[in-house]
Amino acid sequence: SYSTISPSLGAKSLDVMVQAGIIAFILVAILMIVRYRLPGTIAVISLMGQAAATLAVVSGYFTVFPGSTLTLPGIAGIILGIGMGVDANVITAERIKEELSKNKTLEGAVNSGFKMGLTPIIDGNVTIVIVAAILMGAFGPTDGFWAKVFNPIFYWFGPSTAGTIYSFGFTLLTSVLLNFVFGVWATRVMIRGAVHFKPLRKAWLFGGKKEGGADFKTPSINFIGNRKKFYTFSCALIAVVLVFCGIFGVKMDVEFKGGSMITLAYEGDADLSDLKSTIGAELGKSNLTLQTGSDISGNQTLTVTLPGSDTLTTEQLDNLLAALNEQYPDNKFVQNEVSNVDATIGKEFLVKSVVALVAACVLILLYVAYRFRKIGGLKAGSTAIVALLHDMFVVFGVFVLLRIPLNGNFIAALLTILGYSINDTVVIYDRIRENNGLYGKKMSLPELVNLSINQSFGRSMMTSITTCIALAIVCVVSII
């Protein structure tokens, strides 16, 4: 089994991803500064340090990671890391504003903000570390620094079959670890320094009002009272996904089912029926499918897929390209990418991916159950996992609807959702635990949960918006 990509396509793709990362960072920075003023400005500085350090590590700049190289999934991980790195700063800034609204002094509000925000930051980052470790351990190489760390634990997964997933996991792990340095420690040092610098010792610079207090309003949405509406919507969404599966079926990439997939760039118009006959005759295959599209550089592409055990040799690929350019000289066919996967290896990779997902779910469940053992334990962990499975199922439905083949990148996306979406749940659980200690039996459980969700609503919306901005920019720039 092997996979190749055209150097020109790889270079153009790299340029596009770098542009997307820069644009995403600028937009997130503007939003943070406008929303949080001085803490937002400091957050941008810490994010710059985090992004630069992550780029240095994943590029192999530090000799302790000699095998590290910058890849497209790695850049995607850095861009996602920008969105995720905002989380720690948003939690802290929101808590500072909330404490200012209680008419605390600026220094008292800052100290309380850091103290109350640290626990959910740690819990959220630990879940990402769990996911990153599974991505690296299950899909990583069999030698090198990280192999020595993970192979004794993940030896039962067997040898690596997807280096791109490992690269994505390595970038996630690097981003999270550096987030502790820049998003927690560096931000804390800079904000506390600003508090003790007289020209900046003004509450309005930290989200408060000049006359005192802060514009911090807690919503009063009755989430528990409207839970039946949410249940109905979720059930309807799941039903729609199941209908999509029945109508369209689930499309598997060659990574899972085995076979060959060749992507060719070309110019002008192409007759698919005629091309299928020509390619089938040249390869001596009849069970092939053709699909047109475009690559990240905007070139027209033709994707040829041969399922099962019908893998191709390098000689066959060269002969095919020569035959196409001889018969269709005006189209100027150029090989972009080739993936050859043995059917047995494809099935093994599928099983490995499912096991990795299950392992991530179990580990996150156990961690959440332990951390929140005073407010439900296993019930809290199980509920969190059910919500995550719901999110992953919706993403699965989008792949089915858009006819996007399921492959290693899909598994990486699901594992990322596992680690990232749990952050919102962790923050809410942390609030429930805090409010339970404050109010105890003074409030019923539904009232306690409603209050906690509403108090966390602003933070959840802000982190979701920043992450969506980062990911949307990648999509838009890739299309343009």
Regions found by a protein language model. Name each.
Residues S1-I480:
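A structural signal for conserved, well-ordered secondary-structure elements
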